[in-house]
Amino acid sequence: MYKLDTDNKDHNSIIFWFKTWENKVQNKDYESAKILFENHVVSFGTWMNVVEGLEKLCANQWKSVWPTINNFKFLTDTLYIQISPDRLLANSIVIWDSTGCKKNGNSFKRNGRATVTLKRNNINDTWKCIHTHFSLNRGIPQKSYSSI
């Protein structure tokens, strides 16, 4: 029912949103990433418990994590998508992967899961994120120390 359907136009537009954000994370492109989000975004993260607002999300979550990881990737084939009947609100869950760096300089697999809520004003608009919740998988170190 909520599994990814690559024949669904809305699902494909959401895949595109995730791939676009993935590219911004990989390139540490904070300013371009902001375009994908509403200013009033509210989030949970691996670094922040609760963060309100895009500027705080960027300063306190993204800039604390992105410089310390590499190979960030949303595994979009794991996407589950719930779309409202009017097709203006979507809730997605997805698995993600990255490479972190231990204090001693050794790399480690840094993976987890995310819930992302997107909205748009009409079905021809691009999606904007209003909520994210990122969690590391069990047993994954909470901190990555430097870019690899």
Language model regions located:
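A short, acidic/glycine-rich surface segment
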Residues: Y2, T99-N104, G139-P141
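Hydrophobic/aromatic beta-strand elements that line small-molecule binding cavities or substrate pockets
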Residues: W21, Q61-W62, T76-Q82, W96-S98, ...
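Residue-level preference for beta-strand/loop junctions
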Residues: K73, L88-S92, R110-G112
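Short beta-strand edge/turn micro-motifs at domain boundaries
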Residues: R110-S146
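A solvent-exposed, acidic/Ser-Thr-rich amphipathic alpha-helical stretch
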Residues: H11-N12, Y30-L88
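Short, low-complexity N-terminal intrinsically disordered segments enriched in polar/charged residues
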Residues: M1-N39, Y145-I148
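Short, cysteine-centered beta-strand-loop-beta hairpins and adjacent loop/turn segments enriched
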Residues: I69, S98-K109
